[in-house]
């Protein structure tokens, strides 16, 4: 699915990338792991007919962060969603700042404080600033003990979508 995967270059050097697939997503039963979405080969759950773009991975080289590369990747994803007339973007969002707070609060409390603006998380705050809403916390989403395997469930709704 090349139209849903993006690489940002500085000359011939890859400095950022965003990957995703079109999926069915059940917002009534949101608990899942990234592996559930990817399937065994990483794309087995993809179909051009599915209504949601699931952001499976996104990253920017540390030296290029704060330069608009992440925003550009989100805009490319949104452009893909509009082009294919999908309902929006859904993803599990990492919460790297939680590692500094996990001894004193749950992931749910941490995310609530980030959403309220009481705490800053480099990823979640950035996603909110880019029009995403946080729907909750996914437990066991990734194998990352530094954040107890937790991530956020985020959604961006395509206001240009037409059924």
Q: What do the predicted segments below correspond to?
A:
Residues 18-57, 75, 95-122, 128, ...:
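Conserved acyl-donor/pantetheine-binding loop and adjacent beta-alpha core of acyl/acetyltransferases
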């Amino acid at each position: 699915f090349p139209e849903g995967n993006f690489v940002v270059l500085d000359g011939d050097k890859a400095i950022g990338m965003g990957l995703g697939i079109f999926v069915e997503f059940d917002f009534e039963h949101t608990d899942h792991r990234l592996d559930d979405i990817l399937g065994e080969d990483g794309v087995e759950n993809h179909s051009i007919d599915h209504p949601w773009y699931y952001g499976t991975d996104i990253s920017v080289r540390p030296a290029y962060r704060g330069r608009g590369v992440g925003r550009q990747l989100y805009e490319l994803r949104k452009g893909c969603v509009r082009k294919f007339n999908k309902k929006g973007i859904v993803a599990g969002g990492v919460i790297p700042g939680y590692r500094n707070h996990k001894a004193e609060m749950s992931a749910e409390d941490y995310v609530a404080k980030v959403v309220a603006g009481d705490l800053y998380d480099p990823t979640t705050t950035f996603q909110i600033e880019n029009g995403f809403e946080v729907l909750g916390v996914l437990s066991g989403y990734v194998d990352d003990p530094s954040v107890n395997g937790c991530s956020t469930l985020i959604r961006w709704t395509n206001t240009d979508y037409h059924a």
